Amino acid sequence: MLEVHIPSVGPEAEGPRQSPEKSHMVFRVEVLCSGRRHTVPRRYSEFHALHKRIKKLYKVPDFPSKRLPNWRTRGLEQRRQGLEAYIQGILYLNQEVPKELLEFLRLRHFPTDPKASNWGTLREFLPGDSSSQQHQRPVLSFHVDPYVCNPSPESLPNVVVNGVLQGLYSFSISPDKAQPKAACHPAPLPPMP
């Protein structure tokens, strides 16, 4: 899944020889792909260059005009909204995500066909010949229930476990059987009615 937003626009980071009056405006392009988010700073001219490259190869919406009203902040906000709608329009109109757009968004490992199977795309990231391997986490099991039979060397009985067992099964455990010294033997359960 690919989501693209342009949340803000602001002046480009100033270089040592650059005056604040001549700074260019940079659009902060926020990309969310497979749960990972990154930001790409792009100037209007870079958006326009992308448009020139892909307009004959793919379906693209109208590109936002460079001419804006004299009100600088309102015009920048209109341009930001227009560029965001333009990028989202490219994603919506095309069945495959254009390679040029992926480069523009700095995405390397993204399936260009959004209808591609997730399993097929995951295989390229797994090491070696993993098509027949199944990956799962190790399973932890206990031979003896650690809550019923605690092989602790403590001399004091476990009052909580004894109380729960007595309340649930209506039998009592003597302190000697509750905390065995060497081997752990589970408490006997009452016979089934």
UniProtKB/Swiss-Prot annotation:
Disulphide-bonded residues: none
Gene Ontology BP annotations: protein transport
Binding-site list for a 1,2-diacyl-sn-glycero-3-phospho-(1D-myo-inositol-3-phosphate): 43, 45, 66, 79
GO function terms (MF aspect): phosphatidylinositol phosphate binding
Record's bilayer topology term: Peripheral membrane protein
Tissue-level expression: Expressed in erythrocytes (at protein level).
Keywords: Cytoplasmic vesicle, Lipid-binding, Membrane, Protein transport, Transport
Protein's cellular compartments: Cytoplasmic vesicle membrane
Superkingdom in the source lineage: Eukaryota
GO cellular component, one term: cytoplasmic vesicle membrane
Every PX domain range: 1-118
Coiled coil: none
Region annotation Disordered: where it falls in the sequence: 1-21
Record-linked InterPro entries: PX_dom (IPR001683), PX_dom_sf (IPR036871), Sorting_nexin_PX-domain (IPR052467)
Domain writeup: The PX domain mediates specific binding to membranes enriched in phosphatidylinositol 3-phosphate (PtdIns(P3)).
PANTHER family in the cross-refs: SORTING NEXIN-22, SORTING NEXIN-22 AND 24
Quaternary structure and interacting proteins, as annotated: (Microbial infection) Interacts with P.falciparum (strain 3D7) CK1.
Function: May be involved in several stages of intracellular trafficking. Interacts with membranes containing phosphatidylinositol 3-phosphate (PtdIns(3P)).
Similarity comment: Belongs to the sorting nexin family.
Name of this protein: Sorting nexin-22
The species this protein was found in: Homo sapiens
Organism lineage string: Eukaryota, Metazoa, Chordata, Craniata, Vertebrata
